């Protein structure tokens, strides 16, 4: 077994926090392995003044890290699974995930506790077309503006009254110890299905790296790995990008089956389709493909 691992990650506070969670898992199983964090600046980090869908999508948060992986400058990469496209380079694999955190979104507002309570024509900041479509469904009167940046910068924009509210993932807020119940309010899945893979930390490796495969076997949280299959199958089948309003959430039923709620909107946001599938873990991927076909038909 190797004695050191180079781990590629973005430089953000959240990315480094998540990388350290992965290192904790590695150390539990392989206490003698030295883990070196390799911080990589991605295109998505550099370009902050444009919506992701105008500059290449969430893959911009992975491109340089995946290139470092392919060039053997790092041994494994840590990502937020919600940033990972449905189709990744053929020589790479999402080989492990950590246990999923609560996947709900959070309404962040200094003056009101829910989207419904906002005054008429209030301004919400988000760069997510999924969140935008869900908000418009609830409150078509609200103004929605493009809003990017890390957690601290977004909250500062709230304080400076640039917007009335924003929406963030609970998982990121919790990992940064930034969830404050005074102005952070959970949004239920019935109102806003999460991004595919939201709340999951993913480990990506080269398919031919047998040492990393063995390490991933030990740290992989299998129940979460099975849950994300139908969600990721939808994403892969549609080859969806940041212009596509898409969401999904999987959970286990008492009998061990997986229930997945899916959402898909058309590109201009004028229509939205929902679909639910119940599947056996062995066939859960097929349920994502079926959901894609059903929702595409309803939107046509």
Curated annotation (Swiss-Prot):
Pfam families registered for this protein in UniProt: Porphobil_deam, Porphobil_deamC
**Which Cys pairs are S-S linked?**
none
Q: Does the keyword Transferase apply?
A: yes
The biological pathway it contributes to is: Porphyrin-containing compound metabolism; protoporphyrin-IX biosynthesis; coproporphyrinogen-III from 5-aminolevulinate: step 2/4
State the Gene Ontology BP annotations: protoporphyrinogen IX biosynthetic process
Q: Which GO terms describe its molecular function?
A: hydroxymethylbilane synthase activity
- Cofactors named for this entry: dipyrromethane
Q: Which CDD domains match?
A: PBP2_PBGD_2
Question: What's its EC?
Answer: 2.5.1.61
Q: Which family does it belong to?
A: Belongs to the HMBS family.
Misc remark: The porphobilinogen subunits are added to the dipyrromethane group.
Subunit note: Monomer.
Name under which the protein is recorded: Porphobilinogen deaminase
Q: Which organism is it from?
A: Rickettsia bellii (strain OSU 85-389)
Mind giving the lineage of the organism this protein is from? Bacteria, Pseudomonadati, Pseudomonadota, Alphaproteobacteria, Rickettsiales
